[in-house]
Curated annotation (Swiss-Prot):
Database matches in InterPro entries: RAWUL, Znf_RING, Znf_RING/FYVE/PHD, Znf_RING_CS
Organism, scientific name: Xenopus laevis
Cellular-component GO terms for this entry: PcG protein complex; PRC1 complex
Principal location class: nucleus
Single Gene Ontology MF annotation: promoter-specific chromatin binding
UniProt feature, compositional bias: Low complexity: 290-303
Name by which UniProt lists this protein: Polycomb complex protein BMI-1-A
ZnF (RING-type) intervals: 18-57
Localization annotation: Nucleus
Gene Ontology BP term (one): negative regulation of transcription by RNA polymerase II
Annotated spans, Disordered: 239-262, 274-326
Role played: Component of a Polycomb group (PcG) multiprotein PRC1-like complex, a complex class required to maintain the transcriptionally repressive state of many genes, including Hox genes, throughout development. PcG PRC1 complex acts via chromatin remodeling and modification of histones; it mediates monoubiquitination of histone H2A 'Lys-119', rendering chromatin heritably changed in its expressibility. In the PRC1 complex, it is required to stimulate the E3 ubiquitin-protein ligase activity of rnf2.
Quaternary assembly: Component of a PRC1-like complex. Interacts with cbx4.
Annotated gene: bmi1a
Amino acid sequence: MHRTTRIKITELNPHLMCVLCGGYFIDATTIIECLHSFCKTCIVRYLETSKYCPICDVQVHKTRPLLNIRADKTLQDIVYKLVPGLFKGEMKRRRDFYAAHPSADVANGSNEDRGEVADEDKRIITDDEIISLSIEFFDQNKADRKGSKDKDKEKSKDEINDKRYLRCPAALTIMHLRKFLRSKMDIPSNFQIDVMYEEEALKDYYTLMDIAYIYTWRRNGPLPLKYRVRPTCKRVKINPHTDRINHTSGDMESDSGSDKAGSLGVVIPSTSSCIPSPPVQSPHPHFPHISSTINGTSSSSSSHQNPFTNRARKISLNGVSAISSG
């Protein structure tokens, strides 16, 4: 499982700041030849006296460099969403400017150029903004029946009233919301609470602002959240020392069992018995001269017949067969 890494905004500053003015991008504009970005006013003013990129010195255009720059709306939205309060402060400065200079108002300018765009229209959320959310119990059986056509008819008043509405700051984390649910509903500690968006469990460090950005909440209603309660799964930890002791004791029991079986199954005849003892065979039948010891008595190969002596041998010499005795 991949671990999520959180980084500070200061580590992203080199990618969000203009090298000409040293501030965050405002009306981010990118040179199409090298893809370096700057503030619109900064790069336009710079290209009045130069035709080369301020960073890499690539030629923007031979005669009309303003033709090879483009407004980068995606980059500007990222900057507004990452830097707290930047969008609201910029809109306020624009409104103040046009209020102080009415003649500078351009009829063809957009509402954003005049600073008349609200945070809701731009979908920019600030940390101190209050977000309305709804939370209800996640019923798996109800989710399985979601495709039925008569689901609206089957809803009862209890199911409709089961949803609760809250107003929370955008910086509220899922961990805080889980603690609120546990204390509000007296859920024991041996049960785990999962806060979900649709059918996906949310991370504890997610804020309401993160959820609104990740799942593209359109502000057309309360942020819909759900929760479920399930028992906590405890993993049984095995002590390796105990496991090694049990394994050793099992081996000892098996060894003792084999010894008992051997002592019961092998009967060694006594020398005082009237029954003659069977001849002792060498553990090495092909090498009978090697002696073996049984019950402290050494038996030599001399008591056995040597298979290499007193045996007739057939010898062939120049086609004439002769038999000789060893």
